[in-house]
Amino acid sequence: MFLNGQGGQRPPTVASPPLNVRGSISSDFNALGRSRNNSDAMDIYTITDRGPAAERDPAAGRWHANGSPSINSTSSKNPDRYPCYQENGRTYHGYRKGIYMLPCDEQEQDRLDIFHKLFTVARVSDGLIYAPHPTNGRFLDLGCGTGIWAIDVANKYPEAFVVGVDLAPIQPPNHPRNCDFYAPFDFESLWALGEDSWDLIHMQMGSGSVASWPNLYRRIYSHLRPGAWFEQVEIDFEPRCDDRSLEGLAIRQWYQLLKQATEETMRPVAHNSRETIRNLQEAGFTEIDHQMVGLPLNPWHQDEHERRVARWYNLAISESIETMSLAPFSRVFGWPIERIKQIAADVKSEAFNKEIHTYNILHIYQARKPLAN
């Protein structure tokens, strides 16, 4: 179904899978990836070698262009080449320094894991994958963060091969044997991951880190097998309220400032569902499905499921307001840390106010690469 996501009544806080659903979720916040006890991670060459299309060239140390990766795992796993740096009391990764606006410290890793839990709660069933996929397929996670989604998928499907890539090397060293991570890796640069070789490519919360969505979608398209799927999950952080005006509220001002600052950095945080669907279509995707889920900022609703979603989102957004503001407001506007903390405190105060029925929208897309003629 095609929904534009631009106005109208608040969508429900539950998304039903439009297609086959498989996967797994963590049962509570304490299991959000901090107890990842699997070991003996495979090298990406081993993972690809077990796939049906692999053919390695020992002399070149690379994979042929038949659907297999060509990637230097040693250099991609050497974080010492790009040391982290401190800014406004937070730690940022040094790879592509200054481009990405979010930190990579333990506090940020916890925040990302909270969002992962939120998504599994807001989406029915297991909340991991809605797009059709083989249980023994090859899955690629773009901007994998802590790797929690990739690890959950790898644990659910022991016959699958799951690879996560990210700018920051913050993934755990111990993870399932059928899962591996490559960082630092910039998915906006040229890939060497094998065209026509992936059964599913996944991405969540990419807004704010992408300069050209059309270019990225074309690259994703070329790396999927014919008939395979791309799934994307994004939050539109523009505040909405159906029973009052948000004019004059700190949360509205904060979003407008964040939107302006990230637009000036050429990686806007604002999400537009119409543009997303159009860009997916122009990249060649078909069978595009778009779902919207309401995310209340606090548990003001009477429905118990909506209240549960809201409690998780209240925690997630409370951890996000200052974090998302620090780099954009200080680098673009030149704001001192005290001013940033003040507006963040004002926004959080409104987010906790149950008299203000504010919500954001979670967008979920599935798009298919057509079968070859």
UniProtKB/Swiss-Prot annotation:
GO biological process: what's one of them? sporulation resulting in formation of a cellular spore
The UniProt entry, under CDD domains, shows: AdoMet_MTases (cd02440)
Q: Name one Pfam family in it.
A: Methyltransf_23
Composition bias type Polar residues, residue spans: 67-77
UniProt KW keywords: Methyltransferase, Nucleus, S-adenosyl-L-methionine, Sporulation, Transcription, Transcription regulation, Transferase
Name where it's found. Answer: Nucleus
EC id: 2.1.1.-
> Where is it mostly found?
nucleus
Stretches for region Disordered: 1-21, 53-81
The terms describing its cellular component in GO are: nucleus
Q: What positions belong to coiled-coil segments?
A: none
Q: InterPro entries from the xrefs? A: SAM-dependent_MTases_sf
Record field: catalytic activity: L-methionyl-[protein] + S-adenosyl-L-methionine = S-methyl-L-methionyl-[protein] + S-adenosyl-L-homocysteine
**Keyword Transmembrane helix set for record:** no
UniProt-recorded Gene Ontology molecular function terms: methyltransferase activity
Description of how the protein assembles with itself and partners: Component of the heterotrimeric velvet complex composed of laeA, veA and velB; VeA acting as a bridging protein between laeA and velB.
What the record says about family reads:
Belongs to the methyltransferase superfamily. LaeA methyltransferase family.
In UniProt terms, what function does this protein have? Answer: Methyltransferase that performs automethylation. No other methyl-accepting substrate has been identified yet. Component of the velvet transcription factor complex that acts as a global regulator for secondary metabolite gene expression. Controls the expression of the cyclopiazonic acid (CPA) gene clusters. Regulates also pigmentation and conidial head morphology.
Q: Name the chain's protein.
A: Secondary metabolism regulator laeA
| Organism encoding this protein | Aspergillus fumisynnematus
Lineage, uppermost ranks = Eukaryota, Fungi, Dikarya, Ascomycota, Pezizomycotina
